[in-house]
From Swiss-Prot:
Domain of life: Bacteria
SUPFAM superfamilies, sorted: P-loop containing nucleoside triphosphate hydrolases (SSF52540)
Gene: atpB1
Keywords: ATP synthesis, Hydrogen ion transport, Ion transport, Transport
Family: Belongs to the ATPase alpha/beta chains family.
Xref: HAMAP family: ATP_synth_B_arch (MF_00310)
Any GO BP: proton motive force-driven plasma membrane ATP synthesis
Designated name of the protein: V-type ATP synthase beta chain 1
Function: Produces ATP from ADP in the presence of a proton gradient across the membrane. The V-type beta chain is a regulatory subunit.
The species this protein was found in: Treponema pallidum (strain Nichols)
NCBIfam families: PRK02118.1, PRK04196.1
GO molecular function: ATP binding; proton-transporting ATP synthase activity, rotational mechanism
CDD domains referenced in this protein's UniProt entry, alphabetically: V_A-ATPase_B
Length: 430
C-alpha cells in the first residue's frame, strides 16, 4: 500500500523534505507538481525527516504538493528487446520506441559474492594495438581511461564498442553534450553495432539525479545479461561528471564536504560501481571500461586519485594516443602467455626501445650530436607511433605482432633488439 503525504516541510532547489515513517533509503516517490508528476528518490533519512531528490527539479512544487511513496527503488526492464534501444537515466526511451515493462529488476544491488567468481583468464580483442598487444583488456577487468578534456576519449569508446569481441555492449553516458550523444548513436548505427548494444544516456540538460542512476542502470542490465551466459562490456563516460553530480547534490543537502568539495563517501560510491565487474563461474561476464577526465590534467584530482586505488590498472589518453608510459593492465599477464609465443618478449622490448627513442628525442632537442644508434631509434619511434600507437589503426592481434616484427626488422639488427634467439629464428622478417 502506498504511503501518501500532502505536507512538504521544506523545498531547497530540487531537494524536498517531508515527515514520513517506514520509508527506506533509495525508495522512489511520485511528487505532484504544477506541471505534472515527477519521480523523486529518498537520499537522506534523519528519524522521520526524509529528504528526496526530485528528478524534474523544484519548479512547480509547493508545500501542499502530494508525495506518494512507491515502496520500491528504481527498476530497469531487462530482456533481449533492450538490444538496439536508447534510454535516459530514468530508463525512459530516448529513441521514440515503446517503453519496456517486462522482467524488471532493481538497480544498485550488491556486488557478486567472490565465491561465485572465477579468475580472469580470457582476453577481449579490440583491434587497437596499444590495448591488445601492450595493455591487454581481460574479461571481468575494471579499467579507467584517464584523459584530459579535449582528448578523443568518446571516439575511442565508440571504436571499442564497434570492434570489441563481446556479446553485448552497454554504454552509459553521463553529462554528455547532445553532439556527443548523436555521435555515439550514429557511429554505432553505421557500424551495425547498435543491434548488440544498449545505451543509457544522460545529457548535460537532464536532471542531475539521473546522472547518478546511469552507472547503476548499465550495471544492473549488464549483470542480467551475464547471468544469461553473455559476455558484456560496459562502457561509461564520464565518471568525473558522475562524481560532480554527487558533489552538487551533497552541497544542496548541506553535507560536510571532503577533498575539493566532494562528499566523504566518494571512494565507496565509485568502488560500489567498479566492483560489479565479474566473470561468473557458470555463466557470462561483466567487464568495465570507464572514462575519467582529469580537470587540468591533474591525476591527483579526487576522482582519478580514488579511482586508481579501485581499478586494475588504467589507460592514459594523451596527445590523441594511448600513452605507453603510465598505462597499465594489471591482469594482462593472465592472458598474454596464451596468445602467441612472442607476445611478452615483443611487448617488453618494443616498449624498452620506445623509451630509448624518447631519450633520443630529448637529446636531439637539446642540440647534442646524434649517433648512428640514435638515428635508428628516431626512425623506429616514428614507425611505432604511426603503425601501432595511432588510434586510427585497426588490425587484428596477430597482424599487430607481425607489424611489430616488421618495424624492428626495418630499424635494427636481431642482436640489437634484445629478444631471445629462438623467437628471432621463428618470427624475424625475411
Amino acid at each position: 500500500m502506498y504511503k501518501v503525504y500532502e505536507k512538504i516541510e521544506s523545498i531547497n532547489g530540487s531537494v524536498i523534505t517531508v515527515r514520513a515513517k517506514g520509508v527506506h533509503y533509495g525508495e522512489l516517490a511520485r511528487v505532484k507538481t504544477a506541471f505534472g508528476d515527477s519521480l523523486a528518490e529518498v537520499n537522506k533519512l534523519e528519524g522521520d525527516v526524509v529528504s528526496l531528490q526530485v528528478f524534474a527539479g523544484g519548479r512547480g512544487i509547493s508545500t501542499g504538493s502530494e508525495v506518494r511513496f512507491l515502496g520500491r527503488g528504481m527498476l530497469v526492464s531487462f530482456s533481449d528487446y533492450l538490444l538496439g534501444r536508447i534510454f535516459n537515466g530514468s530508463g525512459v526511451p530516448r529513441d521514440g520506441g515503446p517503453a519496456l515493462k517486462e522482467g524488471r529488476v532493481e538497480i544498485g544491488g550488491p556486488s557478486v559474492n567472490p565465491a561465485k567468481r572465477v579468475i580472469a583468464r580470457r582476453m577481449i580483442r579490440t583491434g587497437i594495438p596499444m590495448i591488445d598487444v601492450f595493455n591487454t583488456l581481460v574479461v571481468s577487468q575494471k579499467l579507467p581511461i584517464f584523459s584530459s578534456s579535449g582528448e578523443p576519449y568518446n571516439e575511442l569508446l565508440a571504436r571499442i564498442a564497434m570492434q570489441a569481441e563481446v556479446d553485448v555492449i552497454v554504454l552509459g553516458g553521463m553529462g554528455l553534450k547532445h553532439d556527443d550523444y548523436l555521435y555515439f548513436k550514429s557511429a554505432l548505427e553505421e557500424a551495425g553495432a547498435l543491434s548488440r548494444a544498449v545505451l543509457f544516456v544522460h545529457t548535460a540538460s537532464d536532471p542531475t539525479v539521473e546522472c547518478l542512476m546511469v552507472p547503476d542502470m548499465c550495471l544492473a542490465v549488464a549483470e542480467q545479461f551475464a547471468l544469461k551466459g553473455r559476455d558484456v562490456l560496459v562502457l561509461l563516460t564520464d565518471m568525473t561528471n558522475f562524481a560532480d553530480a554527487m558533489k552538487e547534490i551533497a552541497i544542496i543537502q548541506e553535507q560536510v564536504p571532503s577533498n575539493r568539495g566532494y562528499p566523504g563517501d566518494l571512494y565507496s560510491q565509485l568502488a560500489s560501481r567498479y566492483e560489479k565487474a565479474v566473470d561468473f563461474d557458470d555463466a557470462g561476464s561483466v567487464t568495465i571500461l570507464a572514462v575519467t577526465t582529469m580537470p587540468g590534467d591533474d591525476v591527483t584530482h579526487p576522482v582519478p586519485d580514488n579511482t586508481g586505488y579501485i581499478t586494475e590498472g588504467q589507460f592514459y589518453l594523451k596527445n590523441g594516443r594511448i600513452e605507453p608510459f603510465g598505462s597499465l593492465s594489471r591482469l594482462k599477464q593472465n592472458v598474454n602467455g596464451r596468445t602467441r609465443a612472442d607476445h611478452r618478449a615483443l611487448m617488453d622490448n618494443m616498449i624498452k626501445l620506445y623509451a630509448a627513442y624518447r631519450d633520443a628525442l630529448e637529446k636531439r632537442s637539446m642540440g647534442f650530436a646524434m649517433s648512428e644508434w640514435d638515428e635508428k631509434l628516431l626512425t623506429y619511434g616514428g614507425l611505432f607511433e604511426a603503425q601501432l600507437m595511432d588510434l586510427s589503426v585497426n588490425i587484428p592481434l596477430e597482424e599487430a605482432f607481425d607489424t611489430g616484427w616488421k618495424i624492428l626488422g626495418r630499424c635494427f639488427t636481431p642482436e640489437e633488439t634484445g629478444i631471445r634467439s629462438d623467437l628471432i629464428n621463428t618470427y624475424w622478417p625475411a
